Regions:
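Phosphate-end processing signature that detects enzymes handling 5′-triphosphorylated RNA
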Residues: 1-143
Length: 143
């Protein structure tokens, strides 16, 4: 199974709106996200020139950048995205599935660990300021 390398960063934010610059494989992507409401948020995503994405990542985004490999796995009719982080977030692996609505039933694969939905420290935008390698043992256990 092959994954896609992601390198992403976040522009400084006022907290209500987040702006992410990402390189996914060989594509540049600009994403604008609203604040979270429940388990959902408004999200707008646009492909941008790869060279522009590289410049924005290295000159405009907060550091450290988020580096990970994403794998996609099908389970019970849904596509799970599995992110294996490296760099400042080495050791962290997260799984996510996109739902059609908040009430949609999900059959969890037996390889899923602890539920972290809504736990802010797991947001990629938060991992920039407080990377996984700096977490305490208690935080890594999910307490």
């Amino acid at each position: 199974m092959s994954g896609t390398r992601y390198l992403q960063g976040y522009l400084p934010s006022n907290g209500a709106v987040g702006t992410r610059i990402r390189i996914a494989g060989s594509k540049g992507i600009l994403t604008i996200k609203s604040a979270v409401k429940g388990i959902s948020r408004a999200e707008f995503e646009y492909e941008i020139p790869l060279d522009d994405a590289k410049i924005m990542l290295h000159t405009l985004c907060s550091k450290p950048l988020i580096s990970k490999i994403r794998y996609k796995i099908e389970h019970s009719g849904l596509t799970w995205e599995i992110d294996i982080f490296d760099g400042e977030n080495a050791g962290l692996t997260m799984a996510e599935v996109e739902l059609e609505n908040e009430e949609q039933h999900v059959t969890l694969p037996d390889w899923i660990g602890k539920e972290v939905t809504g736990k802010m420290r797991y947001y990629n935008s938060r991992l920039v300021n407080y990377p996984f390698t700096k977490w305490t043992d208690e935080e890594k256990k999910g307490l």
